[in-house]
Amino acid sequence: MDNGAKFMKMVIAVIKPFKLEEVRDALVAVGVHGMTASEVKGYGRQKGHTEIYRGAEYAINFLPKIRIEVAVPSDRVDKVVEAVIASAKTGQIGDGKIFVTTIDQAVRIRTGETDVDAL
């Protein structure tokens, strides 16, 4: 592992689906050039809800969310986290969570660049 690896972080945000474009725009504005977004389901304090289908009531225990992953140099983490908070926050239960983890290694497949150069 290269010394540059300790300077890489993964910012993972789980947000409401309708906030995706707003969050993407906020990340672009702070210099993020790429991200991964996945449709996921989950629950927390928001819990689920009930829906009626063909006259029967069903408990929906998992709610649709979007998981965003952004790999950044560690000196950019605060700006990325602030951008996600500012753009994803509605003030309601279920706004989501942000997690920051360390990346041990990164490789750009096309060029073979590694670690911070691969971001």
What name fits each language-model region?
Residues 2-119:
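Positively charged, small/polar-rich N-terminal and surface patches that mediate targeting and assembly
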